Amino acid sequence: FGLQGGPAALDPVNLVGDQSVIAGMTRALKPGCRLLLAAFSSYFQITHADGDLSEFDLMTGTRHEVTGIKDPTGYEIAADLWTTCFTPRELWLMAQAAGLEPLTVRSVHSGEDWAADSLDVDHAELLLLARRP
């Protein structure tokens, strides 16, 4: 979640794309079913920035970085990566705005630590559990 693309000139706070994605997820759920959504944590990005927040836009919650991608022959090209990060409160409010009933948000490291049951600044991701009424 939060990987829908770079900054949009017509969406200065970077909400429209993510709101439309979560609205689509809501429509795909049958009533009574649950949504489990993983998103990157703004708190983690800020806490672990090593003093350099130049690549993190505080207004949009978006981190920009450039990486190299190699084709099958080994030729490398530069590629921009834009990652939107969220606070637990933002995820909760976005779920409510999409018509979901948020149940919990917790801090996790995908593939490593799904047992966490609280929020902290040391896990890279947030996990939202919500239900479609």
Explain the meaning of each model-derived region.
Residues 1-8:
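N-terminal/domain-start alpha-helical segments
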Residues 2, 71, 131-132:
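Residue-level signal for short segments within beta-strands and strand-turn junctions
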Residues 9-12, 77-79:
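Short, contiguous strand/loop micro-motifs
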Residues 14, 84, 119-120:
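Aromatic-acidic/polar surface patches that form glycan- and anion
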Residues 14-34:
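A short glycine-rich, Lys/Arg-flanked "PGG" loop and its adjoining helix->strand segment in the class I
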Residues 32-94:
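SAM-dependent methyltransferase
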Residues 88-133:
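C-terminal lobe and adjacent flexible extensions of AdoMet/dcAdoMet transferase-like proteins
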